[in-house]
């Protein structure tokens, strides 16, 4: 059983509705997924279902890897239902006419039915026109149901449902009323991560109750049941190359929590024991062979990170001893000398500063120009970048990556290196950089 919950565009209520549906059906076994590279929406899914949400992305993955990622996650969680939240509009991708990076591409790779979410504010018959347009653009995308969001009242809902069903033949399975309780707080990188929200569990509970009230969940399950067995080739997500036991310290707390679960599992599949630690709360690094500091919001917690002098000194000593550290985006910022003049680790002698506008927002293609912690010279890999910060004075640094698509740190270069350490604005996924875990764990052993 599987379904894609797609929108006609951004800000139509996908995350609230998808998370609410996941919560409402969680007792029946739901494995959540998110199309695209986003870290934050999946944190809501995970809290709603108790199962770790997985990202599926046709820029990061081949169709065969999409099928592998889906079936693998379903098997690991033992879930009956796979619910996939789309990204932006159903057909938005990296090209104005292509499929790559779109929700539609994932639906087709998985042969999954689609339920289209429409912001129906001030719409009646025009909602039917939207459904017809979305259905006719690509007949391989199976739009089997519609959810109307932002319904004014029951009369509005009934009129719009009639228009859609009679003019398009597509079932309307729910109408969600306008309500401030069905909104999610925003931040400069998107929604506020669930890890930061003390009240998020109660909020998700409300969303689940709302979906139980306003959506025909039995009809939704019938749509999910219409999906046949997934057919087609499957392909491994990452390389397996290291069999020597290593310990990898992974920074996980309020400031650093942007990790793809597959990255952690790829490390474990390459003989790593993952040891979580907190740059905010712990006094020093645990006993590990290498350190992985992912993305997050270090700029929001810069005061707390600066005040933990013992942890910063522990990281400085670890680096000075020649042991490897890998920092991604927020992790890169923490490894710099400062963030907005607040002292950080100083692994790299450059300050990071927040700006008032996006400095990088793109899918990325990069090529390694030298052997480094996670890739070898000549390797090409993919990822994404989304940040408002920039690194100052880094133009004379030593860089491991040439950025072929995207911006990087400076002058289309990324992956700044110092000793055994590497820091990059590029967020990688185990499938988009399949050599990542094998190289990282091997280098952790050798260093």
Swiss-Prot record:
Q: Where is the active site?
A: 329
Q: Which Pfam families match?
A: CbiA, GATase_3
Which cofactor(s) does the record list? Mg(2+)
Q: Which GO terms describe its molecular function?
A: ATP binding; cobyrinic acid a,c-diamide synthase activity
E.C. number(s) listed in UniProt: 6.3.5.11, 6.3.5.12
| Residue(s) at site: Increases nucleophilicity of active site Cys | 427
Question: Gene3D superfamilies given for it?
Answer: 3.40.50.880, P-loop containing nucleotide triphosphate hydrolases
Which reaction does this enzyme catalyse, per its entry?
Answer: cob(II)yrinate + 2 L-glutamine + 2 ATP + 2 H2O = cob(II)yrinate a,c diamide + 2 L-glutamate + 2 ADP + 2 phosphate + 2 H(+); Ni-sirohydrochlorin + 2 L-glutamine + 2 ATP + 2 H2O = Ni-sirohydrochlorin a,c-diamide + 2 L-glutamate + 2 ADP + 2 phosphate + 2 H(+)
Sorted alphabetically, which InterPro entries does this protein's record hold?
CbiA/CobB_synth (IPR004484), Class_I_gatase-like (IPR029062), CobQ/CobB/MinD/ParA_Nub-bd_dom (IPR002586), GATase_3 (IPR011698), P-loop_NTPase (IPR027417)
Task: Report the residue ranges that make up the GATase cobBQ-type domain in this protein.
Answer: 247-435
Q: Which biological process, per GO, is one annotated for this protein? A: cobalamin biosynthetic process
Q: In which pathway does it act?
A: Cofactor biosynthesis; adenosylcobalamin biosynthesis; cob(II)yrinate a,c-diamide from sirohydrochlorin (anaerobic route): step 10/10
Q: Which top EC class is named for this enzyme in its record?
A: ligase
Q: Which SUPFAM superfamilies match?
A: Class I glutamine amidotransferase-like, P-loop containing nucleoside triphosphate hydrolases
**Keyword Signal in record:** no
| Protein keywords | ATP-binding, Cobalamin biosynthesis, Glutamine amidotransferase, Ligase, Magnesium, Methanogenesis, Nucleotide-binding
Record remark: domains = Comprises of two domains. The C-terminal domain contains the binding site for glutamine and catalyzes the hydrolysis of this substrate to glutamate and ammonia. The N-terminal domain is anticipated to bind ATP, and cobyrinate or Ni-sirohydrochlorin, and catalyzes the ultimate synthesis of the diamide product. The ammonia produced via the glutaminase domain is probably translocated to the adjacent domain via a molecular tunnel, where it reacts with an activated intermediate.
The miscellaneous annotation reads: The a and c carboxylates of cobyrinate and Ni-sirohydrochlorin are activated for nucleophilic attack via formation of a phosphorylated intermediate by ATP. CbiA catalyzes first the amidation of the c-carboxylate, and then that of the a-carboxylate.
Q: What is this protein's function? A: Catalyzes the ATP-dependent amidation of the two carboxylate groups at positions a and c of cobyrinate, using either L-glutamine or ammonia as the nitrogen source. Involved in the biosynthesis of the unique nickel-containing tetrapyrrole coenzyme F430, the prosthetic group of methyl-coenzyme M reductase (MCR), which plays a key role in methanogenesis and anaerobic methane oxidation. Catalyzes the ATP-dependent amidation of the two carboxylate groups at positions a and c of Ni-sirohydrochlorin, using L-glutamine or ammonia as the nitrogen source.
Q: What HAMAP family does the annotation carry?
A: CobB_CbiA
Q: Which family does it belong to?
A: Belongs to the CobB/CbiA family.
What's the name of the protein?
Cobyrinate a,c-diamide synthase
Gene symbol of the encoding locus:
cbiA
């Amino acid at each position: 059983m599987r379904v894609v919950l797609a929108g006609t565009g951004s800000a139509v209520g996908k995350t609230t509705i998808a998370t609410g549906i996941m919560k409402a059906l969680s007792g029946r076994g739901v494995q959540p997924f998110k199309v695209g590279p986003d870290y934050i929406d999946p944190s809501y899914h995970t809290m709603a279902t108790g199962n770790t949400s997985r990202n599926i992305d046709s820029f990061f993955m081949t169709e065969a890897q999409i099928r592998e990622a889906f079936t693998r996650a379903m098997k690991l969680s033992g879930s009956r239902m796979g619910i996939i939240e789309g990204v932006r509009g159903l057909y938005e991708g990296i090209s104005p006419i292509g499929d790559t990076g779109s929700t539609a591409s994932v639906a087709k790779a998985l042969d999954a039915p689609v339920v289209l979410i429409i912001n129906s504010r001030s719409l009646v018959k025009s909602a039917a026109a939207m459904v017809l347009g979305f259905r006719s653009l690509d007949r391989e995308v199976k739009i089997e149901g519609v959810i109307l969001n932002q319904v004014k009242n029951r009369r509005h809902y009934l009129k719009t449902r009639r228009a859609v069903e009679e003019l398009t033949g597509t079932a309307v399975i729910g109408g969600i009323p306008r309500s401030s309780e069905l909104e999610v707080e925003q931040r400069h990188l998107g929604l506020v991560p669930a890890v930061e929200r003390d009240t998020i569990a109660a909020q998700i509970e409300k969303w689940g109750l709302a979906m139980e009230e306003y959506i025909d969940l039995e009809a939704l399950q019938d749509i999910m049941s219409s999906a046949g067995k997934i057919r087609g080739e499957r392909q491994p997500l990452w390389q397996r190359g290291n069999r020597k036991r290593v310990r990898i310290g992974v920074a996980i707390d309020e400031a650093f929590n942007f990790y793809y679960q597959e990255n952690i599992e790829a490390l474990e599949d390459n003989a790593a024991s993952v040891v979580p630690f907190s740059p905010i709360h712990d006094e020093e690094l645990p006993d590990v062979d290498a350190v992985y500091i992912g993305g997050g919001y270090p700029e929001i917690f810069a005061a707390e990170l600066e005040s933990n002098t013992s942890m910063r000194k522990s990281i400085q000593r670890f680096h000075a001893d020649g042991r490897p550290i890998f920092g991604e985006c927020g992790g890169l910022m923490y490894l710099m000398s400062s963030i907005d003049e607040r002292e950080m680790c100083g692994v790299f002698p450059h300050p990071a500063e927040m700006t008032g506008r996006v400095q990088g927002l793109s899918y990325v293609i990069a090529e390694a120009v030298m052997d480094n912690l996670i890739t070898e010279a000549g390797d090409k890999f993919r990822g994404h970048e989304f940040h408002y910060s920039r690194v100052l004075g880094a133009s004379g640094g030593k860089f491991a990556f040439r950025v072929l698509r995207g911006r990087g740190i400076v002058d289309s270069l990324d992956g700044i290196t110092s000793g055994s350490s590497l820091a990059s604005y590029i967020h990688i996924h185990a499938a988009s950089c399949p050599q990542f875990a094998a190289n990282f764990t091997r280098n952790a052993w050798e260093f």
